[in-house]
UniProtKB/Swiss-Prot annotation:
Its EC number is 2.7.4.9. It catalyses: dTMP + ATP = dTDP + ADP. The gene is tmk. Keywords: ATP-binding, Kinase, Nucleotide biosynthesis, Nucleotide-binding, Transferase. It comes from Methanococcus maripaludis (strain C6 / ATCC BAA-1332). This is Probable thymidylate kinase.
């Protein structure tokens, strides 16, 4: 049976790079949020600095996820899926803006629970160095990234978490490690959790 694996972490943790590498190694379909659909493109514009109420942005993310989940369920019939970000990003990023957790959970109620979540951690200063060459998005400020990092750990440690993955969470620290080192750690941890994932 095909598996749905999600990569999460603060900006600059190496998540997109590793998600793509793992997808390739597992012969999985790579996907991401926000998606490249119409709603996802609107979200990207807002993240680049367009004005928008925080609740509106939360609802847009949830609407984009409706489309994404539909595609994930279809694609899971054919292969494993690896997603760069998912509902956990909405929970921690939007809570960092003061949106109540219950509101975020309610609007994401339909979200499919993944089999496994890989959380990549990184020292905040190293994350900022990695992001220096990128265009800045509204969430890419050190105070916000610190809040988001704390939010991820709070989410992982909470009991009866609504979106608790079937095989739980894997946490990998990417600080001062090469791309290959991190990749090997992630792959070994995934195989340890789901031994039959590699055919």
């Amino acid at each position: 049976m095909n598996k749905f694996i999600v990569f999460e972490g603060i900006d600059g943790c190496g998540k997109t790079t590793q998600a793509k590498l793992i997808a390739e190694r597992l012969n999985a379909k790579f996907t991401f949020e926000p998606t490249d659909g119409k709603i996802g493109k609107s979200i990207r514009e807002i993240l680049s600095g367009s004005k928008c109420q925080k609740e509106t942005l939360a609802l847009l993310f949830a609407a984009d996820r409706v489309e994404h989940v539909s595609k994930i369920e279809e694609d899971l019939k054919k292969s494993h899926i690896v997603s760069d970000r998912y509902v956990y990003s909405s929970i921690v990023y939007q809570m960092s803006q003061g949106i109540p957790k219950d509101f975020i959970y309610t609007i994401n109620d339909y979200a499919k629970t993944p089999d496994l979540v890989v959380l990549l951690d990184v020292d905040l200063n190293e994350a900022l160095k990695r992001m220096e060459s990128r265009e800045k998005e509204i969430f890419e400020k050190i105070e916000i990234q610190k809040k988001i990092k704390e939010g991820y750990y709070s989410l992982i440690n909470s009991e009866n978490e609504k979106f608790m993955p079937t095989y739980g969470f894997i946490i990998i620290d990417t600080t001062s490690k090469s791309i290959n080192q991190v990749f090997d750690e992630i792959l070994n941890a995934i195989i340890d959790k789901i031994p039959d994932i590699i055919q």
